[in-house]
From Swiss-Prot:
Coiled coil: none annotated. PANTHER family: FORMATE-DEPENDENT PHOSPHORIBOSYLGLYCINAMIDE FORMYLTRANSFERASE. It catalyses: N(1)-(5-phospho-beta-D-ribosyl)glycinamide + formate + ATP = N(2)-formyl-N(1)-(5-phospho-beta-D-ribosyl)glycinamide + ADP + phosphate + H(+). Mg(2+) binds at residues 267, 279. The keyword Electron transport does not apply. ATP binds at residues 114, 155, 160-165, 195-198, 203. This is Formate-dependent phosphoribosylglycinamide formyltransferase. It is an enzyme of class 6 (ligase). InterPro entries: ATP-grasp, ATP-grasp_carboxylate-amine, ATP_grasp_subdomain_1, PreATP-grasp_dom_sf, PurT, PurT/PurK_preATP-grasp, PurT_C. Pathway: Purine metabolism; IMP biosynthesis via de novo pathway; N(2)-formyl-N(1)-(5-phospho-D-ribosyl)glycinamide from N(1)-(5-phospho-D-ribosyl)glycinamide (formate route): step 1/1. Homodimer. Keywords: ATP-binding, Ligase, Magnesium, Metal-binding, Nucleotide-binding, Purine biosynthesis.
Length: 393
């Protein structure tokens, strides 16, 4: 049976979080509610999750030796990656030595790289995906695009939040897309995936949680992206029963293959009753921020329970709900947010400000949340709230 000790004592249950953005911050808050001792690690100081953890370390998490040193110093019971850009080979070694990585080190390694997870889904599991090719050079990228046809997508195999992604409408776009992908990759210049276009009706995130009692699914989350970056999400996304059943089949297959415990954000394309696998994150998903108001147990509460081996007997969806991001553009280390009385004036609205220490360019700094009697009404309410936030740099 699971047991949780006293934080900052010899009996403490220690979790080391790798990556301290807004998703990690909400997870730490849920872990704190269970009395877990949390150590937060990221490449910069005062990251959001560090502000609610017991202590923190600043290091380059792609540096395997530095990551190993802090893990051996802290001796956590669980290592929980919150981002892709981690020395996953070191996590594999540490897992072999007896550490527990959530959900598994293999899951972190495969999903850090679009090639690993795409080959698992399409070639090993036989799941429907968009047609694709990988390319290491501009010439290979051009050949792949010409073979797949236009429009098509070019993405770095290692990136997140839409960085380095572009849509090619013709062969005239290939050179610029290649350079953009090289600039946007997490590990610098390198391999890209070229994907054929799928004419889908909508895309969803199916939040899938593997826990002590089995596998559970949240209601599907619909979302709107711009340049690969989430702008809005809503729950529940209406789906044909056959499409929802197929989405669950695909999500179950890929999460079973990855194994371990925790929440997974399974991204899927849907057209009518057809469903295609797109990507998977073995951790809370940014589009799942809507669950802060749409469910009795948010994706972060579900992840915390799953990690700790606690039961998840039911997930209650509370009705139409939506999220809309608060974007800040400019240069500042002292951003302030005003007009909050108007932001929160409507019933059933909420606001989360992430507390990020600065902005350089464009950055997601908060999210507005809303519930209403329909998805459209909830979306409009969330968008109004987000737009009402007054930014001062």
């Amino acid at each position: 049976m699971p047991r949780i000790g006293t934080p900052l004592s010899p009996s403490a249950t220690r979790i080391l979080l790798c990556g301290c953005g807004e998703l990690g911050k909400e997870l730490v808050i849920e872990l704190q509610r269970f009395g877990v001792e949390v150590i937060a690690v990221d490449r910069y100081a005062n990251a959001p999750a560090m502000q609610v953890a017991h202590r923190s370390h600043v290091l380059d998490m792609l540096d395997g030796a530095a990551l190993r040193a802090v893990i051996e110093q802290e001796r956590p019971h669980y290592i929980v990656p919150e981002i892709e850009a981690i020395a996953t080979a070191t996590l594999v070694e540490l897992e072999r030595e007896g550490y527990t990585v959530i959900p598994t080190a293999r899951a972190a390694q495969l999903t850090m790289n679009r090639e690993g997870i795409r080959r698992l889904a399409a070639e090993e599991l036989g799941l429907p995906t968009s047609p694709y090719r990988f390319a290491d050079t501009l010439d290979e990228c051009r050949a792949a695009a010409m073979a797949l046809g236009f429009p098509c997508l070019v993405k770095p195999v290692m990136s997140s939040s839409g960085k380095g992604q572009s849509v090619l409408r013709s062969d005239a776009d290939i050179d610029a897309a290649w350079e953009y992908a090289q600039a946007g990759g997490r590990a610098g210049r390198g391999r890209v995936i070229v994907e054929g276009f799928i004419d889908f009706d909508y895309e969803i995130t199916l939040l899938t949680v593997r826990h002590a009692g089995g596998t559970s699914f949240c209601e599907p989350v619909g979302h709107r992206q711009e340049k690969g970056d989430y702008q809005e999400s809503w729950q529940p996304q209406p789906m044909a029963p056959a499409a929802l059943a197929e989405a669950k089949r695909i999500a179950l297959a890929v999460t079973d293959a990855l194994g371990g415990r925790g929440i997974f954000g399974v991204e899927l394309f849907v057209k009518g009753e057809q469903v295609w696998f797109c990507e998977i994150s073995p951790r809370p998903h940014d589009t799942g921020l809507v669950t802060l108001v749409s469910q009795d147990l948010s994706e972060f509460a579900l992840h915390a329970r799953a990690i700790l081996g606690l039961p998840i007997p039911v997930i209650r969806q509370l009705g139409p709900a939506a999220s809309a991001v608060v974007l800040v553009e400019g240069e500042s280390t002292q951003v302030s947010f005003g007009n909050l009385a108007e932001v929160l004036a409507e019933p059933d609205t909420a606001l989360r400000l992430f507390g990020k220490p600065g902005v350089s360019g464009q950055r997601r700094m908060g999210v507005a949340l809303a519930r209403d009697t329909s998805i459209d009404a909830a979306r409009q309410k969330a968008l109004r709230a987000a737009a009402a936030v007054k930014i001062e740099l």
